[in-house]
Curated annotation (Swiss-Prot):
Comp. bias intervals (Low complexity): 345-356
UniProt GO molecular function: heme binding; metal ion binding; peroxidase activity
Record's keyword annotation contains Transmembrane: no
Role this protein plays: Cargo protein of a type 1 encapsulin nanocompartment. Has both general peroxidase activity and dye-decolorizing activity. Can catalyze the oxidation of both protoporphyrinogen IX and coproporphyrinogen III to their corresponding porphyrins. Also efficiently decolorizes the dyes alizarin red and Cibacron blue F3GA. This cargo-loaded encapsulin nanocompartment is probably involved in protection against oxidative damage.
Classification of source organism: Bacteria, Bacillati, Actinomycetota, Actinomycetes, Micrococcales
Membership in a protein family: Belongs to the DyP-type peroxidase family.
The protein's name: Dye-decolorizing peroxidase
Amino acid sequence: MTEAFPNGKTPQHVLGPPAPAAVFLVLTVRSGAEAEAKDFLGDIAGVVRSVGFRAREDHLSCVTGIGAELWDRMFDAPRPAGLHPFIEQRGDVHTAPSTPGDLLFHIRARRMDLCFELARQLVGELGDAVSVVDEVHGFRYFDERDIMGFVDGTENPEDQEAVDSVFTPTGGDDPASSTYVIVQKYTHDMAAWEALSVEDQEAAFGRHKLSDMEFPDEDKAPNSHLILNTIEDEDGTEHKIVRDNMVFGSVESGEFGTYFIGYAADVSVTEQMLENMFIGNPRGTYDRILDFSTAQTGGLFFVPSQDFLDDPDGELAAAEPSDAQNDDPASASARIEETDPPNPASADDPAPADDSLGIGSLRRRDQ
């Protein structure tokens, strides 16, 4: 059984400890197959349980995201406030492209065979209603490091801060207990990166490579990754997202990369991070890491509550007219306790809150 937030809504299984294995699937839905795709949303939890039941100790889970164009085709209701196609970031030197994507499946487990089997079953159930436009098999790399050798996710929020950073509150513009996710596939020029001295690599990140200790602010370069990924309000309040990046690669092709995936209650936080990285802050002061990293894909998805996936039409009907404005916004913020049960799209017991994922920091864009 699943325990809902105090607002009565059950979120998808976004927060959890870093998994050793993951499969990222981005699909497009064939024109005319919208009804099939919508009907399948309620079946996803059952498929996850069927695959994961045979190995509950390996914590199989799946997060489902819906793209803006598919939302318009599937539902008569307006899009959630933050849902729109991924915004291309075209800087003077580097570009973050916007690429097709109607559905996202973020599959995680302790074993790749479980991830693979779930991916196979999900796509098989959808049949010719969908096409796979991107598939990445990710793995955890040496003490939580990325392929470039630096620890990834050090600044991720934890516990209640993670919940508040990720899930939309009751009484806001979005359905409660939902979130937004942005995904990008980056490939790295490892030969050029490894030709740098460790000192130059550390300057690009703003962090020591071996110890993972952050540089003092006065020692960080203005184009360092940490500087450009710190998002603050005018009053100095820092805004964070939760990311679960994974390494991928092929020795045969020589392609090595990082799959970026970032969850946020306010997607503009992640978008401001990307604008800083690619356009620069100020313009032209782009992220030094991009001289060695190329964004190949870019997608933005709405991740509704599990209640919505189980009955989207019912949830949308219940929201008209919405009495959400009369609710206490704080009621959607719930601490994830160690004893919380898994949500329906997870085949295992939940992870302790102090193992929850977190992220680097970001500055909120004025809207």
